[in-house]
Amino acid sequence: MDVRVGGKYRLGRKIGSGSFGDIYLGTNISTGDEVAIKLESVRSRHPQLIYESKLYKILTGGIGIPTLYWYGIEGDYNVMIIELLGPSLEDLFSICNRKLSLKTVLMLADQMLNRIEFVHSRHFIHRDIKPDNFLIGRGKKMSIVFAIDFGLAKKYRDPRTQSHIPYREGKNLTGTARYASVNTHLGIEQSRRDDLEALGYVLMYFNRGSLPWQGLKATTKKDKYDKIMEKKMSTPIEVLCKQFPFEFITYLNYCRSLRFEDRPDYSYLRRLFKDLFFREGYQYDFIFDWTFLHAERERERQRRSMVNQGAESGNQWRRDASGRDPLGRLPQLEP
């Protein structure tokens, strides 16, 4: 069945799902370019897609921000059509056997700090910094890290008056507990400092392979959040970053020292990691741990795609009712 959305996009197979809807591969009928199509039921209890689309519009033009092509309502669905990207940092972390080299972690830190600073410069905080929400580009953009998923983002200051949102307590945890800042666990309203602290935990997750508060047994969500908070607060930063360069300790201590309304010194944090990078003798060549692994998979995917293209066009019956392709191909690396 030929399903079209946004006037000129053909809906393809499902390539992923998030907490607020499903993501499909799409094709621009005029150009043949592939896109990502995100769908969310209009009957969703907490619709977020139209809000997220508006965020992408506000962030338009930023390096590492996916291009928004169209958003609106089609039938029973809120629809957002954006640039198709490659795998997430979580996917790539798994491809690399769940451990990244210091060189790769530092190149990621540089780009991720840039993305967070840009979002903050547009008066928003992300509030869900995690490896799943950073994707690499495709083709010529394979060395660019993109920030995605702005459904939980919040305006932290008035663009006109520059007035900061007020300090509040008693807030429920927004985001992902594993990477949430200590203040977020304590129920304090999030601000710029919390995005940066979360990034610190992401970087240590990549360095170590896991975080000390992962895999804790709990009976309820609240119990789990409480146990994560207790473990996070009782693990000294020096212990968390043990056997890794002191810059990671300095980074997290700096983030935790910031006051609610403080503007972080992004340049200082980038310089911290860049100095370490060059002191270690690394070349800023955009060759990550996964570069060759991913390129190899991508070539194999394209080869198989070409082999199967002819067969697919005349053999739609091969797909089962769910839309899955039982031909047993390599797993797709798109989001």
Swiss-Prot record:
Disordered: region residues: 304-335
A Pfam family the protein falls into: Pkinase
Q: Protein kinase domain: from which residue to which, for each copy?
A: 9-278
Output compositional bias ranges, type Basic and acidic residues: 317-327
EC number per UniProt:
2.7.11.1
Disulfide connectivity for this sequence is none
Signal peptide positions are none
Alphabetized UniProt keyword annotations: ATP-binding, Kinase, Nucleotide-binding, Serine/threonine-protein kinase, Transferase
Keyword Nucleotide-binding among UniProt keywords = yes
What does the entry list as the binding residues for ATP? I15, G16, S17, G18, S19, F20, G21, D22, I23, K38
Any one Gene Ontology molecular-function term assigned to this protein's record: protein serine/threonine kinase activity
Say which family it is in: Belongs to the protein kinase superfamily. CK1 Ser/Thr protein kinase family. Casein kinase I subfamily.
Described function: Casein kinases are operationally defined by their preferential utilization of acidic proteins such as caseins as substrates. It can phosphorylate a large number of proteins.
Q: What is this protein called?
A: Casein kinase I
Could you tell me which species this protein originates from?
Eimeria tenella (Coccidian parasite)
